[in-house]
């Protein structure tokens, strides 16, 4: 599973095309019955046509797809910091899914998990229940409720894509909002510009 080609590792790999090349090199180690699952809404991943003679399984949000997807979502409805609901369309059929973690990026994570689960033979009910039971880990959209405030702990290994996604989650919260942003590493020559863009986005 490759979720996106972002800006991590630019320091060593120079460009997003370099990152794509490095990530897809792992396909050479795929077993004969292996499956590659990719985000069909990513402008780089959507260009991957075949892996060892097989078409990858793509997922995405309806209307944004840059290629034909096997699993897609639409009717995405946000419920603040409580999560979101969406309609998932799969080869097995359609299902309404509750994702208990806020942020559109987590719709993509749930779509990727759905693709994996289908490859492993899980039923639609099992997939739906599994997604509804998902929880976060420390440093990844982890909600910490304290007296009079909620902290959104999303500090693990930040990059421009994850930082903007975290700011999107913050924007859905009620009340006064304060964003505490740290450095983003491994961004190479574009480091200053990418930090500036995140600051402007905030």
Predicted features and spans:
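Extended acidic/charged loop-beta regions that coordinate divalent cations
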Residues: 1-10, 43-96, 137-138
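Flexible active-site lid/hinge loop adjacent to a nucleotide/diphosphate
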Residues: 1-51, 186, 190
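Residue-level signal for inorganic ion chemistry
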Residues: 3, 19, 37, 73, ...
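Short gly/ser/thr-rich secondary-structure transition/capping motifs
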Residues: 17-21, 58-61, 132-136, 161
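Short secondary-structure boundary/capping segments
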Residues: 27-28, 48-49, 76-78, 141-143, ...
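Residues at the starts of beta-strands that form the adenosine-phosphate
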Residues: 35, 55, 176-177
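Nucleotide phosphate-binding/pyrophosphate-handling subdomain across enzymes
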Residues: 81, 91-202
């Amino acid at each position: 599973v490759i979720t996106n080609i972002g800006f991590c590792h630019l320091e060593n790999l120079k460009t997003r095309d370099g990152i794509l090349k490095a990530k897809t090199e792992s396909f050479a180690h795929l077993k004969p019955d292996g499956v590659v699952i990719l985000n069909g809404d990513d402008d780089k991943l959507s260009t991957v046509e075949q892996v060892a003679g097989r078409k990858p399984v793509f997922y995405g949000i309806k209307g944004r797809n840059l290629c034909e997807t096997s699993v897609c979502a639409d009717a995405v409805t946000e419920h603040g910091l409580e999560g979101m609901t969406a309609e998932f369309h799969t080869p097995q059929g359609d299902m309404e899914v509750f994702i208990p973690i806020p942020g559109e990026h987590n719709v993509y994570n749930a779509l990727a998990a759905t693709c994996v689960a289908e490859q492993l033979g899980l039923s639609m009910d099992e997939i739906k229940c599994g997604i509804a039971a998902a929880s976060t880990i420390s440093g990844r959209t982890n909600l910490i409720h304290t007296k009079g405030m909620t902290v959104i702990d999303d500090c693990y290994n930040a990059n421009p894509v994850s930082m903007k996604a975290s700011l999107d989650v913050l924007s859905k919260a009620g009340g006064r909002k304060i964003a505490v942003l740290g450095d983003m590493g491994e961004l190479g020559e574009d480091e200053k510009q990418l930090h500036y863009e995140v600051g402007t986005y905030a």
